[in-house]
From Swiss-Prot:
UniProt key word Nucleotidyltransferase: no
Gene giving rise to this polypeptide: aspS
Keyword Cytoplasm: yes
Chief place of localization: cytoplasm
Quaternary organization: Homodimer.
Name under which the protein is recorded: Aspartate--tRNA ligase
GO cellular component terms listed in the entry, alphabetical order: cytoplasm
Keywords associated with the record: Aminoacyl-tRNA synthetase, ATP-binding, Cytoplasm, Ligase, Nucleotide-binding, Protein biosynthesis
């Protein structure tokens, strides 16, 4: 027997028992007559000790380095009261070693387990990094999350059905990872960005409750919280309304938070996309932050200040105010930093007004734009924003998107900087009624979610007549400012699907070439269906309290989509490329 107990499972009830432990040397203290070691496995750490009276095993112990892999046999002993370590789960006991087997000693480590290592070091030696208790705990939590999800899905009649990894490239927003076919020379498979079409086809096949915990792939420009391969909890249902789907999934997340964190999330509020953008400048609002944007275009449309009156009178303009309680104490340097910050989002500046004394008229206001605004205007602004003495007002005035993005980001930053955001709270919500389409930089329409999302309460003819104002029957679950899941009611009418493709500029020939199988399937009694997908990586981030998505993935990629440990991607064997009919063209470096 290599192991009778996990290290972290030992406690006072095991005193007097002989146990066999297998794990790694975590720390060593040589006190001359005794050598104390902490032995670690995935469940925790326990202290063992060697007595010099047993010369043979004492000699072996003297040769062991940190991270040596060993087997320990010994007797569990209660520590003296004065020696109890309350910082350790096993701190009431220790193990007197009677025998030791060295599976493998360890070379000098390239990582220092007692210090912060660079992320590059951690990713290069990931197998060592994962031995750290805090990393092991995150992956154990991830496993428990997936176990909970599987139980919940099984209890609610869902079937776990796998969908293909090698599939056809279809336009879903990001670039596909392509896999060349040796058998079909010159043709390529695509790795799925999501199982979207296959899960819809499963609904058409009669499997009315499907789920899958599945890898997805997107070849896109990466951010700190994105990975080229990521894991979804993918869900689809037939004969359920959007409200019923949301209730099912809300109950799952509610149960998950109780199971993992003993936190009751309560009933999730529902907010339209329009309300979220107006009040918070984001379609994934962090409701732990009490600050809100207040629209004031009607108050400022007649002032003699172009920065305000032009967007206030423009159809695509927006003028809004962010009131920060006690913000009048901000220094000019801090305000200048916020001005630079909103510039990242396209804002040309950041007007502000300190309300030093709300009862002193213009004399109680300090602002570089005060000369353009009279007392009546300021009185209206103060009333609209509920400002009081000691507050500061930040103004956003520009095109609607610029103001919404910049002021929404400023709201988050100020909330963090001034400790207004309650970091101990959990604030979930549903965001619904997204626009069906959005305009790209060239003014063309693209699907805000994906082209299989159903519009809300529209016929194909009505949608074609006014696509810009169409509302999608879509919904996102947001927790603490993170979109953890999103979905929609799907199109199940072939005419509606062709109409959406047409609005997106996909002609009939391309529709048949790219989606012919879907359009055919829609003709044969397709049921109404709806679903969504959760990001497992992001859920695990939230539950474990980390802000780095790489901490909850066993073997993640860098932000450059590389694996430092295996050195992937790598150059392919020339013979393999020849068999595939592929020639690699070297890109010329930009001068």
């Amino acid at each position: 027997m290599m192991r009778s107990h996990y290290c972290g499972a030992l406690n006072r009830s095991h005193v007097g028992q002989t146990v066999t432990l297998s794990g790694w040397v975590h720390r060593v203290r040589n006190l001359g007559r005794f050598i104390f070691m902490q032995i670690r496995d995935r469940e925790g750490i326990v202290q063992v000790f060697f007595d010099e009276k047993d010369e043979a095993i004492f000699k072996i112990a003297s040769s062991l380095r940190s991270e040596a892999c060993v087997q320990i046999q010994g007797e569990v002993i209660a520590r003296d009261e004065s020696q109890i370590n309350k910082e350790m789960a096993t701190g009431e006991i220790e193990v007197l070693v009677k025998n030791v087997v060295v599976y493998n000693n360890a070379d000098v480590l390239p990582l220092d387990f007692n210090q912060n290592n660079t992320e590059e070091q951690r990713l290069k030696y990931r197998y060592l990094d994962l031995r750290r208790p805090e990393m092991a705990e995150k992956l154990k939590t991830r496993a428990k999350i997936t176990s909970f999800v599987r139980r919940y899905m099984d209890d609610n009649g869902f079937l776990d059905i796998e969908t293909p990894m090698l599939t056809k490239a279809t336009p879903e927003g990001a670039r596909d990872y392509l896999v060349p076919s040796r058998v079909h020379n010159g043709k390529f498979y695509a790795l799925p960005q999501s199982p979207q079409l296959f899960k819809q086809l499963l609904m058409m096949s009669g499997f009315d409750r499907y789920y899958q915990i599945v890898k997805c792939f997107r070849d896109e420009d990466l951010r700190a919280d994105r990975q080229p391969e990521f894991t979804q909890i993918d869900v689809e249902t037939s004969f359920l309304t959007a409200e019923e789907v949301r209730e099912l999934m809300e109950n799952m997340i509610h149960g998950l938070w109780l199971d993992r964190l003993n936190v009751d999330l309560g009933k999730f509020p529902i907010m339209t996309w329009q309300e979220a953008m107006q009040r918070f400048g984001s379609d994934k609002p962090d409701l732990r932050n009490p600050l809100e944007l207040v629209d004031v275009a009607d108050i400022l449309k007649d002032v003699e200040f172009k920065v305000f009156n032009e967007p206030a009178n423009s159809a695509d303009g927006r003028v809004t105010v962010l009131r920060v309680p006690n913000g009048a104490s901000l220094t000019r340097k801090q305000i200048d930093e916020y001005t630079q910050f909103v510039g990242i989002y396209g804002a040309k500046g950041l007007a502000w007004a300190k309300i030093n004394d709300v009862n002193a008229g213009m004399e109680g206001i300090q602002s570089p734009v005060a000369k353009f605004l009279n007392e009546e205007v300021f009185k209206a602004l103060i009333e609209r924003t509920n400002a009081t003495s000691g507050d500061i007002l930040f103004f956003g005035a520009d095109k609607w998107q610029v103001v919404t993005d910049s002021m929404g980001a400023l709201r988050l930053k100020v909330g963090r900087d001034l400790a207004l955001t309650d970091l101990s709270a959990w604030k979930p919500l549903w965001v619904i009624d997204f626009p069906m389409f959005e305009k790209d930089d060239e003014g063309n329409l693209s699907a805000m979610h994906h082209p299989f999302t159903s519009p809300k309460n529209l016929t194909p003819e009505e949608l074609a007549a006014n696509p810009v104002n169409a509302v999608a029957n879509a919904y996102d679950m947001v927790i603490n400012g993170y979109e953890v899941g999103g979905g929609s009611v799907r199109i199940y009418d072939p005419k509606m699907q062709q109409t959406v493709f047409g609005i997106l500029g996909i002609n009939e020939q391309d529709q048949q070439e790219k989606f012919g199988f879907l359009l055919d399937a829609l003709k044969f009694g397709t049921p109404p269906h709806a679903g969504l997908a959760f990001g497992l990586d992001r859920l695990t981030m939230l539950i474990t309290g980390t802000e780095n998505i790489r901490d909850v993935i066993a073997f993640p990629k860098t932000t450059a989509a590389a694996c430092l440990m295996t050195e992937a991607p790598s150059f392919a064997n020339p013979q393999a490329l020849e068999e595939l009919g592929i020639a690699v063209l070297k890109k010329e470096k930009a001068e």
